[in-house]
């Protein structure tokens, strides 16, 4: 398995992976335009030239970043791929001037295992809510907010 920064040629494969999980309502859908605009935020994992997982670190505010669009092919769950991707995002964060990283997730125990602490969503800056407001599940999505200082 190889993990690297995403390139524009990877976007269609990232899109398909995210589309699968958004159809199951466990991730927010991302448009192709949004993915192309934010391709530099993404790390991907590939095996034999095929993208099997992705994760992005998105800069949100001053020193605050968000882990988002974390997806691993279902048949590969439990193999530590998601942890490796999040660890790379956390390692990359200080280079961007980010020292607090949050996630909004339906799988809080995964992030707690990586040292994230649960917080009330209201503690996050209002800028974070720009995507939430357009979500069909807003305001009762059930996602849990977690944060980690690095």
Residue ranges and their predicted role:
Residues 93-106:
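Conserved GNAT acetyl-CoA-binding A-motif
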Residues 78-91, 103:
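Conserved acetyl-CoA-binding loop-helix of GNAT-fold acetyltransferases
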Residues 18-51:
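Active-site rim helix/loop that mediates acceptor-substrate recognition in acyltransferases
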Residues 44, 50-58, 63-71:
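Conserved beta-strand in the GNAT
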Residues 2-14:
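A short beta-loop-alpha structural element at the N-terminal edge
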Residues 105-131:
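Conserved active-site alpha-helix within GNAT-family acetyltransferase domains
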Residues 50, 73-84, 96, 113:
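Conserved glycine-rich acetyl-CoA-binding loop
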Residues 124-150:
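C-terminal "cap" of GNAT-fold acetyltransferases
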